[in-house]
């Protein structure tokens, strides 16, 4: 079981992908995080690929937990958000102040201060264009939808996903429904209706993704499956005739052998390929909005590999010297880097003879996650493996680069303060 609130170390990514059905990242997005396979997995990324190829609208959704520092370890999610925004995605960002109150006891006032000072100003400084940033506690649409989603799940499911026990308070138990509503509310009618939605996450957040994807499907009238043929079934106990006829008419305009069955509440169609499913799902979702306010497309997700902390393990706010905060003074960041662990050998002679081990080196991770020059990063990797690079040189070089970047970010952060009203929606 994965705990999305307290995962403290690395995962066996391939085992998790097999166990929970996370697919390989198979769409070649032109961003270094994807090119370097730092984004290891995906769910339904074909919906985003379809939207891009057909010039359709799509949503980009993420959230922030206002409980600690924004650091390089969680920065890559925003790097992806900015990348997808440049491709045309409509960005929404939730400040999880209700979740931070329920799971970590942080007051709403403190959460607001942390969200703005530690996160939102940095997002803008990094290049995020105006978008919708909101606080859970002030968004009535999210609260309403969370209430409605509660009618589509039960305690047995939540115990299975999260390990909840009788000692967990109801606010904590409700937090996953709030998070599901954060993502799904972007497809409500007032926000433009059904649309592909991508959520960049770490593997530790997969329980949330599984729940919200299941909830999205349960809110639909139509359920779509491809067996030997396409099967569109109608959920519920109401008379299905109107829905069956609508799906039948739609599919008959595209395929030749289409049959409907009122008794079994299904429409079947031959000759449908796997690649047709995305378009069919999107079309039926839009048709369904005539009858259903919650005709959601199950959200897509990208799964990123965790960044190593400078003291080993994953980069985490619980070990201050293991992370580089985006609010760190450049001198402090330099100190942390120079004191960081490496993948080097015990002596210079061994390093030259045996080569270093960049794959387990936190210093190399700084290059890999933060430097967009593919050629230089590959050169650093190869020279380390071949014993041509010493750890001290790498530390000094990346410390200089990070100090310069943090200094520039600090200036942009102050400029961003004047633009907050373009982002925060209340």
From Swiss-Prot:
<protein>
    <recommendedName>
        <fullName>Tryptophan--tRNA ligase</fullName>
        <ecNumber>6.1.1.2</ecNumber>
    </recommendedName>
</protein>
<keyword id="KW-0436">Ligase</keyword>
<dbReference type="GO" id="GO:0006436">
    <property type="term" value="P:tryptophanyl-tRNA aminoacylation"/>
</dbReference>
<keyword id="KW-0648">Protein biosynthesis</keyword>
<feature type="short sequence motif" description="'KMSKS' region">
    <location>
        <begin position="314"/>
        <end position="318"/>
    </location>
</feature>
<comment type="similarity">
    <text>Belongs to the class-I aminoacyl-tRNA synthetase family.</text>
</comment>
<feature type="short sequence motif" description="'HIGH' region">
    <location>
        <begin position="66"/>
        <end position="74"/>
    </location>
</feature>
<keyword id="KW-0547">Nucleotide-binding</keyword>
<keyword id="KW-0067">ATP-binding</keyword>
<dbReference type="Pfam" id="PF00579">
    <property type="entry name" value="tRNA-synt_1b"/>
</dbReference>
<keyword id="KW-0963">Cytoplasm</keyword>
<dbReference type="InterPro" id="IPR002306">
    <property type="entry name" value="Trp-tRNA-ligase"/>
</dbReference>
<dbReference type="InterPro" id="IPR020653">
    <property type="entry name" value="Tryptophan-tRNA-ligase_arc"/>
</dbReference>
<dbReference type="InterPro" id="IPR002305">
    <property type="entry name" value="aa-tRNA-synth_Ic"/>
</dbReference>
<dbReference type="InterPro" id="IPR014729">
    <property type="entry name" value="Rossmann-like_a/b/a_fold"/>
</dbReference>
<keyword id="KW-0030">Aminoacyl-tRNA synthetase</keyword>
<dbReference type="GO" id="GO:0005524">
    <property type="term" value="F:ATP binding"/>
</dbReference>
<dbReference type="GO" id="GO:0005737">
    <property type="term" value="C:cytoplasm"/>
</dbReference>
<dbReference type="GO" id="GO:0004830">
    <property type="term" value="F:tryptophan-tRNA ligase activity"/>
</dbReference>
């Amino acid at each position: 079981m994965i705990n999305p609130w307290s995962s403290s170390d690395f995962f066996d990514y391939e085992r998790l992908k097999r166990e929970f059905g996370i697919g390989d990242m198979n769409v070649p997005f032109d961003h270094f995080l994807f090119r370097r396979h730092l984004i290891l997995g995906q769910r339904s990324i074909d919906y985003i690929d379809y939207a891009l190829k057909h010039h359709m609208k799509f949503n980009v959704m993420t959230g922030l937990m206002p409980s600690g520092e924004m650091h390089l370890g969680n920065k890559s999610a925003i790097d992806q958000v900015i990348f997808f925004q440049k491709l045309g995605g409509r960005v929404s960002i939730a400040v999880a102040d209700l979740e931070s109150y329920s799971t970590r006891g942080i007051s709403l006032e403190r959460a607001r201060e942390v969200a703005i000072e530690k996160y939102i100003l940095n997002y803008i400084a990094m290049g995020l264009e105006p978008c919708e940033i909101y606080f859970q506690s002030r968004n009535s649409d999210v609260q309403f939808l969370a209430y409605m989603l509660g009618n589509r799940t039960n305690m047995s499911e939540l115990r299975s996903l999260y390990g909840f026990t009788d000692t967990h308070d109801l606010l904590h138990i409700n937090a996953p429904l709030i998070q599901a509503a954060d993502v799904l509310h972007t497809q409500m009618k007032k926000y433009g209706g059904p649309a592909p939605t991508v959520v960049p996450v770490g593997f530790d957040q997969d329980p949330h993704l599984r729940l919200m994807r299941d909830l999205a499907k349960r809110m639909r009238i139509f359920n779509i499956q491809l067996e030997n043929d396409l099967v569109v079934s109608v959920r519920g106990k109401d008379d299905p005739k109107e829905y069956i006829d609508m799906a039948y008419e739609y599919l008959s305009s595209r395929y030749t052998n289409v049959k409907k069955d009122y008794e079994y509440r299904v429409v079947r169609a031959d000759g449908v390929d796997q690649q047709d499913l995305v378009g069919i799902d999107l079309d039926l979702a839009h048709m369904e909005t005539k009858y259903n306010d919650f005709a959601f497309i199950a959200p897509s997700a990208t799964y990123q590999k965790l960044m190593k902390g400078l003291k080993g393990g994953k980069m985490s706010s619980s070990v201050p010297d293991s992370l580089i905060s985006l609010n760190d003074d450049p001198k402090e960041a330099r100190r942390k880097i120079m004191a960081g662990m490496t993948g080097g050998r015990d002596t210079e002679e061994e390093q030259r003879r045996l080569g270093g081990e960049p794959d387990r080196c936190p210093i190399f991770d700084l290059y890999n996650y933060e430097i967009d020059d593919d050629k230089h990063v590959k050169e650093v990797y190869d020279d380390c493996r071949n014993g041509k690079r010493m750890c001290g040189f790498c530390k000094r070089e990346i410390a200089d680069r990070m100090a310069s970047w943090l200094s520039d970010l600090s200036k942009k952060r102050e400029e961003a303060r004047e633009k907050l009203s373009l982002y925060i929606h209340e």
